[in-house]
């Protein structure tokens, strides 16, 4: 066995030794100690008496110990060589009593108190747990001193000093020490039941404190458990999964296995209290208290398990402008049909018909046509529409003078310009190449007839000056310069070689 395996070594020097010392002369003095030297090498008495015996004088005890050490050694023991026969070797040959510690050192009586201070003031908790208290050792020493040689040849206190393993392992040596010591003066040894095993804490000094602590600890944990259970009971819905827990019945429902004993694991549903034989059956069980909440879209009947998903889905069902636009043209179409029947339909190829759908028409327009009640957002769209009406009336052969509200509403002009317009009648007619008759003056663009040339010129200036582009080679008129250019390139390719005046301003003569 390796050295230092059983006993913890420390920095402080102790009288314990684990090997034979060859050159020391103090060993003989230790063996010849009047107090406990002879207890190590003296052979056992043939019949130890448990009762107390009177201690012999110190001189006789010293001579007896010396004689026993030099001459009375057993056979298995090595030949005596002075005091070295009592060192660590075969202790069973010198003392047949049961020894529980293989390291039984030699000690002096006068160093007992110093040994107590060294061995029990160590900083290691292991040594404090492994060895008894100094009071018990001192008490044992007092009792052993009274017993003398009748205690099996041991010094007072040796059973407790040199057998720490016995104190930790069992009660055999303590019982033997009690029997060997017998009733003597001094305090009794501590009972074996009071000696605790190593690694355990000492019991509390009072017995009233542990129950108080034990009562306080559960009291501190109970409110937490109650609060947790109460919180779990409040959670009865799942907003994401769409599940809800219904309220339980008043009486607890009976288990499925009627009349059978309770299952071993007691796999019980915590909601409906139904019992199952195994956890797999409990996992597959569909509780009657758990219901699925469905959120259905009222527009398309689509089902969702979360109300937030339904709200996101319903954003796609906002009212669209297509149905409103489809309902709006119904009265407008009726008005166009009436206008189509009243003036009739025939017009030139380049002029739109009044009954046609105009892309500029709008229900919320600010400019309204008094013929068909159609509204336009811009005056230009309304003028274009009125020209179509006038061309239709001219083709029918019954031209009517446009109402005054059309001209006044669209182009309100000052009245003082009328004489200047009348003075420039001849020049304006010559520029446009118009042949005015004595009876009436027709508008070359829309075919309206006027009583005077000034009225016709005013009509041309206000209504057709900026938007009408007449063709030089044919009586067709256009409302934009690109339209006139396309017409000339398509219908008059041979005359396109000449320089064409795209726009002829109508101005009165100075």
UniProtKB/Swiss-Prot annotation:
Residues 64-74, 209-218 have a biased composition (Low complexity). The keyword Transport does not apply. Residues 43-58 are annotated as: Necessary for interaction with CCND1. Residues 43-59 have a biased composition (Pro residues). Induction: Up-regulated by transcription factors, such as MASH1, NEUROD1, NEUROG3, NGN3 and TCF3. It comes from the Eukaryota. Its main location: nucleus. Expressed in pancreatic duct cells. Expressed in several tumor cell lines of neuroendocrine origin including pheochromocytoma, medullary thyroid carcinoma, insulinoma, medulloblastoma, retinoblastoma, pheochromacytoma, medullary thyroid carcinoma and small cell lung carcinoma. Interacts (via the SNAG domain) with HDAC1. Interacts (via the SNAG domain) with HDAC2. Interacts (via the SNAG domain) with KDM1A. Interacts (via the SNAG domain) with RCOR1. Interacts with SORBS1. Interacts (via the N-terminal region) with CCND1 (via cyclin N-terminal domain); the interaction competes with the binding of CCND1 to CDK4 during cell cycle progression and increases its transcriptional repressor activity. Interacts with HDAC3; the interaction increases its transcriptional repressor activity. The C-terminal region is necessary for NEUROD1 promoter DNA-binding and transcriptional repressor activity. Sequence-specific DNA-binding transcriptional regulator that plays a key role in neurogenesis and neuroendocrine cell differentiation during embryonic and/or fetal development. Binds to the consensus sequence 5'-[TG][TC][TC][TT][GA]GGG[CG]A-3' in target promoters. Acts as a transcriptional repressor of NEUROD1 and INS expression via its interaction with cyclin CCND1 in a cell cycle-independent manner. Negatively regulates skeletal muscle-specific gene expression in endocrine cells of the pituitary by inhibiting the Notch signaling pathway. This is Insulinoma-associated protein 1. It comes from Homo sapiens.
């Amino acid at each position: 066995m390796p050295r230092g395996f059983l006993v913890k070594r420390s920095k402080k020097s102790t009288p314990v030794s684990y090997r034979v010392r060859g050159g020391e002369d103090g060993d003989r003095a230790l063996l010849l100690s009047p107090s406990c030297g002879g207890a190590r090498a003296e052979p056992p008495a043939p019949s130890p008496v448990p009762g107390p015996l009177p201690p012999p004088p110190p001189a006789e005890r010293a001579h007896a110990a010396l004689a026993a050490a030099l001459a009375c050694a057993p056979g298995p023991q090595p030949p005596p060589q002075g005091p070295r026969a009592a060192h660590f070797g075969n202790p069973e040959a010198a003392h047949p009593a049961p020894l529980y510690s293989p390291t039984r050192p030699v000690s002096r009586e006068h160093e007992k108190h110093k040994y107590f201070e060294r061995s029990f003031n160590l900083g290691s908790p292991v040594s404090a747990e492994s060895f008894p208290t100094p009071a018990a050792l001192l008490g044992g020493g007092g009792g052993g001193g009274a017993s003398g040689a009748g205690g099996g040849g041991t010094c007072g206190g040796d059973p407790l000093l040199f057998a720490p393993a016995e104190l930790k392992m069992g009660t055999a040596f303590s019982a033997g020490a009690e029997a060997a010591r017998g009733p003597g003066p001094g305090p009794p040894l501590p009972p074996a039941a009071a000696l605790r095993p190593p690694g355990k804490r000492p019991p509390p000094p009072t017995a009233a404190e542990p129950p108080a602590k034990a009562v306080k600890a559960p009291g501190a944990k109970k409110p937490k458990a109650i609060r947790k259970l109460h919180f779990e009971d409040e959670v009865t819905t799942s907003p994401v999964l769409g599940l809800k827990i219904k309220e339980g019945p008043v009486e607890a429902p009976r288990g499925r296995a009627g009349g059978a004993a309770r299952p071993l694991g007691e796999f019980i549903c915590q909601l409906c209290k139904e019992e199952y034989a195994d956890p797999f059956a409990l996992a597959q069980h569909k509780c009657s208290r758990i219901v699925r909440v469905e959120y259905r879209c009222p527009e398309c009947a689509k089902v969702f398990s979360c109300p937030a998903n339904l709200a996101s889905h319903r954003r796609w069902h906002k009212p669209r402008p297509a149905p409103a636009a489809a309902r709006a043209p119904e009265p407008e179409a009726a008005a166009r049909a009436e206008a189509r029947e009243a003036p009739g339909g025939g017009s030139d190829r380049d002029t739109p018909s009044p009954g046609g759908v105009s892309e500029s028409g709008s229900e919320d327009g600010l400019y309204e046509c008094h013929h068909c009640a159609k509204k336009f957002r811009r005056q230009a769209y309304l003028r274009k529409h009125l020209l179509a009406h006038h061309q239709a009336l001219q083709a029918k052969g019954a031209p009517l003078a446009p109402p005054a509200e059309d001209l006044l509403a669209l182009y309100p002009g000052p009245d003082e310009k009328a004489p200047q317009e009348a003075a420039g009648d001849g020049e304006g007619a010559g520029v446009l190449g118009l042949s005015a008759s004595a009876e009436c003056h027709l508008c070359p663009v829309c075919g309206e007839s006027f009583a005077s040339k000034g009225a016709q010129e005013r009509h041309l200036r206000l209504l057709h000056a900026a938007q009408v582009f007449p063709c030089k080679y044919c009586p067709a008129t256009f409302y934009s310069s690109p339209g006139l250019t396309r017409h000339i390139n398509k219908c008059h390719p041979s005359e396109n070689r000449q320089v064409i005046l795209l726009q002829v301003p109508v101005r009165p003569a100075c």
